From Swiss-Prot:
This is Ribonucleoside-diphosphate reductase subunit alpha. Belongs to the ribonucleoside diphosphate reductase large chain family. The record marks 695, 698 as: Interacts with thioredoxin/glutaredoxin. The record marks 683-684 as: Important for electron transfer. It is an enzyme of class 1 (oxidoreductase). Under complex allosteric control mediated by deoxynucleoside triphosphates and ATP binding. The type of nucleotide bound at the specificity site determines substrate preference. It seems probable that ATP makes the enzyme reduce CDP and UDP, dGTP favors ADP reduction and dTTP favors GDP reduction. The record marks 170, 409 as: Important for hydrogen atom transfer. It comes from Bacillus subtilis (strain 168). InterPro entries: NrdE_NrdA_C, RNR_1b_NrdE, RNR_lg_C, RNR_lsu_N, RNR_N, RNR_R1-su_N, Rrm1. Tetramer of two alpha and two beta subunits.
Amino acid sequence: MSQNQVPKWIQLNNEIMIQKDGKFQFDKDKEAVHSYFVDYINQNTVFFHNLKEKLDYLVENQYYEEEFLSLYSFEDIKEVFKTAYAKKFRFPSFMSAFKFYNDYALKTNDKKKILERYEDRISIVALFFANGDTEKAKEYVNLMINQEYQPSTPTFLNAGRKRRGELVSCFLLEVNDSLNDISRAIDISMQLSKLGGGVSLNLSKLRAKGEAIKDVENATKGVVGVMKLLDNAFRYADQMGQRQGSGAAYLNIFHRDINDFLDTKKISADEDVRVKTLSIGVVIPDKFVELAREDKAAYVFYPHTIYKEYGQHMDEMDMNEMYDKFVDNPRVKKEKINPRKLLEKLAMLRSESGYPYIMFQDNVNKVHANNHISKVKFSNLCSEVLQASQVSSYTDYDEEDEIGLDISCNLGSLNILNVMEHKSIEKTVKLATDSLTHVSETTDIRNAPAVRRANKAMKSIGLGAMNLHGYLAQNGIAYESPEARDFANTFFMMVNFYSIQRSAEIAKEKGETFDQYEGSTYATGEYFDKYVSTDFSPKYEKIANLFEGMHIPTTEDWKKLKAFVAEHGMYHSYRLCIAPTGSISYVQSSTASVMPIMERIEERTYGNSKTYYPMPGLASNNWFFYKEAYDMDMFKVVDMIATIQQHIDQGISFTLFLKDTMTTRDLNRIDLYAHHRGIKTIYYARTKDTGQDSCLSCVV
């Protein structure tokens, strides 16, 4: 492509990298945004004389749903839009504007013209959340236009649209051990995938390869055959060609098929075995870590023989208690393995392909508030959703199915930097909780019965956070420092406090709690023990100054909250989890999730041109605080995630960043340290090719 064919905004964006006086020209990105609007967005946005004409057109032509708009008078709707436009919001970087208009803004059916600006999308989402309450809609507008809170991609993309996918993006399905159950799980996975959801499945109950069916030995194909079916199903069923279907399979490490399961992700694997798009995760109980640490032989088990012997599925049982009994029981079929060799294989595979994800099962369940419903047995596609589940049993045509509890989770994220600048933790957490609750209550997924049942019974939501590294760097705090952990400790304690408080307030307002609340550690009061006995306020003066003007809940406040919950209960069974925040963090001009950045200046290729995205807030005076994840001490990153994790009732999508010079032994050491520090899950392991490094720090 010749220079004059490259759009002006791309040329300006590229000029960031042309040094002037030995420094990058970060201001060129603002010029690129200006050009993008003047030369492209404004030229390609459909013109309407006024808001009335615009809304009438969008409703009549089936772009917007009429139902939620009809809850308001036109004057009220106008007020909400006025609130959004009064902010005079400007995208600070080309990438943030490009991501919004490319991925989220409503366009004409032929995709050629733009029908929504950022303010329009926010107003529509706010009107949808507020359900007829104009004042609340304005509060939501302010929350989103100030970029204090960001709904997840499916919610932000779909809310208010007539032709849309679901507002919930994340589903977890239990799979029972019969052909009826397996085929029903594949069917439900395809239905959810069609709605744009990512689906993860627990395969730990399935018979291992070579187990008996109706006492006929060597009859079963094992979990890999089911994985192949799922792999094809997700590739077939996507959201009308817009979002690709995506799925994950989890397996307990004590399942006999664990080696075959891992081999599906080997780069050299045979086509008959390899799964191309299905992600995989391994569930590791403490017992396995103990056997590896002591360098003892371990056994993996044929799960159906356990079910026949004990009447319970292996993944529902406590391995610390049952492992030796399984080993000693001659009726439980088993195979001997070397646990260290298996951990080495896990490390090798992760440095090769990034998979599998890892869930340390006992770290999850030691602090799980709802073990009375079920322990947590698997996670989701991004390894941050951790909830109780109960397997369904699908019978033949004229018999009644037993519907269990599957999992759905609707997500959203606080933008730490803006919440801290506006000193609005309490307000933001409570409004965000309300918006997520509305999404949960309006979601009704009819073709996934156990998801539908659980959504009504469990009322789970997942509030997360983004821009941790950006906030720390712009305040001159190194991500790996004790001060950074001190900030995170206080901030996430406060998020937890206000999230519990709002959940209890909603329970009081509605006179309703989540199903089986009575057996939870919220009801017994045990959940609050550490908070009424430990002060989580900042230890460093610099960090205390950041919270100036905000009330930090004290142990006394926690005692009062404990009493309030004892009186009114909790509306949500699960409240907090930290998702990876991919494209949505670009729109927010935010560093992703609570992870360190991967690059100070990202290079992206779109079509025939390159674009550059300097990390939000990056400047020559804070360059070294934007340290790249691959240059960090991963043990310190583990410490940061462990600090945050103690305040998050579910999980954190935690990526490991590895250099290609690391050995499998190095990775095993990080894993074992993560396990020791109480980390619940590890998402991808990303490996960087260090042979291509070039130093940019001299040109700031």
